A protein has these predicted regions:
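Patatin-like phospholipase
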Residues: 17-64, 76-305
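Bacterial N-terminal signal peptides
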Residues: 5-15
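Gly/Ala-rich beta-loop-alpha elbow adjacent to hydrolase catalytic centers
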Residues: 66, 70
């Protein structure tokens, strides 16, 4: 009996001394957030309001991808300017600084009458961007940045990630008829909105864990067609609907500022566009915060790198 008691005591002692070490809890790096900023000409000022409102909530991007007007704002943001600084810059900007001195209506008339490839070279826009990013190439900006353009010969999407920042933005923003195509390394490029109106899939391909897309495009039924420029933008809107739906399926959340009624070709409505961007973030903020919180929870997984 004593023998069995002694054996039991040894077993209990061994059990008490043996500790099961739980698997280590390894925290993954913070989720990479991307802003996918869509095209929309002068309505692109709404991107500034979106960025301002997100920054106020502590939400910033690691990756920025822009199409057309989105590439303009995106380049400035990736270079380190915050939303307020970009807005201040936009308030002191006039059309001549980015349109080579041509008004939009005059531009279209000149192009059609003279059969030109575009009445705006885009050099002023290129210089404006390079001046405000301090001449840094894309790969040297503070955040990962990409600008989306369309190869005019093949119709394929091209994603610029390195090289002259202003030139890439110029290519991404070269709306046909208004801007001349941009030649880079022997290839001609036009507005990226033809292939990726809201470049969410590109943001995802660059390693984003969470993509916040900003859609500033007009719905066709919301557009006036009172003149030739209106008809052109209406055509772009119709053309981009299907592509836009496909692109937005790659986003985790889509912010849609109310931009219908805002002119596509007049920068004078910039303050209203900024305000609409801020309002759009406020409307979707509860859902956005909930999704980000859920994403962060899943990154604290026991025993996983």
């Amino acid at each position: 009996m004593k023998k069995y008691a002694f054996t039991l005591l040894l077993l209990l002692g061994t059990s008490a001394c043996t500790q099961v070490t739980p698997p280590p809890v390894v925290e993954r790096p913070p989720a990479k957030i991307a802003f996918a900023l869509g095209g929309g000409a002068a309505r692109g000022f709404a991107h500034i309001g979106v960025i301002k409102a997100l920054e106020a909530q502590g939400i910033t991007a690691d990756i920025v991808v822009g199409t057309s007007a989105g590439s303009v704002v995106g380049a400035l943001y990736a270079a380190g300017l915050n939303g307020f600084q970009i807005q201040e810059l936009s308030m002191n900007m006039n059309e001549d600084q980015i349109l080579d001195g041509s008004g939009m209506y005059q531009c279209v008339v000149e192009t059609v009458v003279s059969n030109k490839r575009g009445c705006i070279k885009g050099q002023a826009l290129q210089d404006f961007i390079n001046r405000n990013v301090h001449g840094l190439p894309m790969e040297k900006l503070g955040k990962t940045f990409a600008a989306v353009a369309t190869n005019l010969r093949t119709g394929e999407m091209v994603v610029f990630r390195s090289g002259n920042t202003g030139m890439a933005v110029r290519a991404s923003s070269s709306v046909p008829v208004f801007f001349e195509p941009v030649t880079i390394s022997g290839q001609e490029y036009v507005d990226g909105g033809l292939v990726a109106p809201v470049p969410a899939s590109v943001a995802r391909s660059l390693g984003a864990d969470f993509v916040i897309a900003v859609d500033i495009s007009d719905r066709p039924q919301d557009k006036s067609t009172a003149g030739i420029t209106d008809i052109m933008w209406q055509t772009f809107s119709i053309f981009g609907q299907t592509i836009n739906r496909h692109e937005q399926s790659s986003a985790d959340i889509v912010i849609r500022p109310v931009t219908y009624g805002l002119p596509s070709t007049d920068v004078s409505g910039s303050n209203k566009a900024v305000l609409e961007g801020e309002k759009a973030v406020a409307a979707i903020l509860p859902e956005l915060k909930a999704r980000l919180a859920k994403l962060n929870e899943t990154r604290h997984v026991a025993g996983m790198p």
